[in-house]
Structures are given as C-alpha cells and as structure tokens.
C-alpha cells in the first residue's frame, strides 16, 4: 500500500510504502464448537522519516504513520500482532464467541486501517430468535485499534490517535484522562 501527502508550502510532505501479509486458521465446526487463530505482519518498504514532526504544526504524519504502528514510529521491521484467538459455539443460527476476534457491529467495525483493522477481546453473541430479529451484544474488555500492535483496555484505547482541539484551542487530550467502571 503506497500513500503520500503533498502539503501546502511551508508544511512537511510525507510518503510511505507498506507491505504485509497474514495467516489465519479456522477449524470446521465440531459439535457446534469452532476455534480460530490469525496473525498479521507489516513491513515498512520505504518511507519518509515518520519520526520527524512538522516544524509548523509540531505533529507527526497522521496518515502515513497509520500504515504501521502509531505508538512506535521508529519500528520499521517488527510490526506484527496476534489478531484472532477465539473459541466460538454455534447453536441454531446463533453463536457465542470468546477470545480475540474481528467484530463488525453497529458500534464497532473493522474500520479502514489500510493495513490492519481494529480487533477486540471479550465475549460476544449474535442471536436470531426469529426471522426478522437479530440481537447482538457482549462484554469487551481489550482493544487493539487499527494502526497499533498492542492491546489496551477500553479507556486506554481512546485517545491513541492525534486528536482535534477544543473550542478554545486547547488539545482534547483524552488519552490517560478517562475513567470507567468497566475496562
């Protein structure tokens, strides 16, 4: 995946070229049970210096860095993550899943991370009690957002990305400033 940002004069231009691949294994259903595991790796095949902040904004490249690991801009070679590791139980047309897995729901989706999606850890179910009714929900306690390699609790996963500013011009600064009774 290649991308480049050509900014206006006075701002830094960036480019990045990423390559990667993944392995995934999912068993056939056995008495309703199914196991899955997957991992993904990314390599920086060539880029501008993604550790260099723009002199005018004092910010790193937002988009090009997102191809790799936003938490570790220096890492160009060891960008890998165990993405899925789950046990799933199928019953009727429904299922119950536990572990690390990809989730597409009205609230959380795979998102376009270009090189890797967001992944969740917890327990999740989709129930189909009737032809026109679908119920889904669960308890998610860890997240590995797109463009990262590590796992974070719910409150620690919010604010990892560069954020906007408040109406008065101050940084929003969600990261490490949220509390929750959950995760």
Named regions from a protein language model:
Residues 1, 37-41, 98-100, 137-141:
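Transmembrane beta-barrel strands of outer-membrane/channel proteins
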Residues 2-18, 54:
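Surface-exposed strand-loop-strand hairpins of Gram-negative outer-membrane beta-barrel proteins
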Residues 16, 114-183:
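Signature for the C-terminal beta-barrel architecture of outer-membrane proteins
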Residues 26-28, 88-92, 126-130, 183:
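Structural signature of outer-membrane beta-barrel channels/translocons
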Residues 20-22, 83-86, 122-124, 183:
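Membrane-embedded beta-strand positions in outer-membrane beta-barrel channels/transporters
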Residues 32-35, 93-97, 132-135:
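Repeated loop/turn-to-beta-strand initiation elements of outer-membrane beta-barrel proteins
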Residues 7-11, 70-73, 108-111, 176-178:
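Extracellular loop and loop/strand-boundary signature of outer-membrane beta-barrel proteins
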Residues 88-103:
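Surface-exposed extracellular loop regions of Gram-negative outer-membrane beta-barrel proteins
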């Amino acid at each position: 995946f290649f991308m480049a940002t050509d900014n206006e004069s006075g701002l830094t231009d960036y480019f990045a070229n990423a390559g990667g691949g993944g392995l995934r294994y999912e068993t056939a259903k056995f008495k309703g049970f199914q196991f899955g595991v997957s991992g993904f790796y990314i390599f920086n095949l060539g880029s501008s210096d993604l550790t260099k902040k723009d002199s005018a904004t004092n910010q790193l490249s937002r988009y090009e860095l997102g191809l790799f690991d936003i938490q570790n801009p220096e890492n160009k070679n060891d960008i890998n993550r165990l993405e899925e590791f789950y046990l799933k139980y199928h019953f009727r047309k429904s299922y119950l899943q536990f572990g690390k897995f990809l989730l597409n729901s009205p609230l959380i989706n795979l998102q376009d991370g270009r090189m890797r999606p967001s992944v969740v850890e917890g327990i999740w179910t989709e129930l189909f009690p009737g032809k026109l009714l679908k119920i889904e929900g669960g308890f998610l306690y860890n997240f590995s957002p797109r463009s990262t390699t590590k796992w974070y609790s719910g409150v620690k996963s919010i604010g990892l990305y560069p954020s906007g500013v408040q109406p008065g011009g101050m940084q929003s600064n969600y990261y490490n400033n949220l509390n929750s009774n959950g995760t």
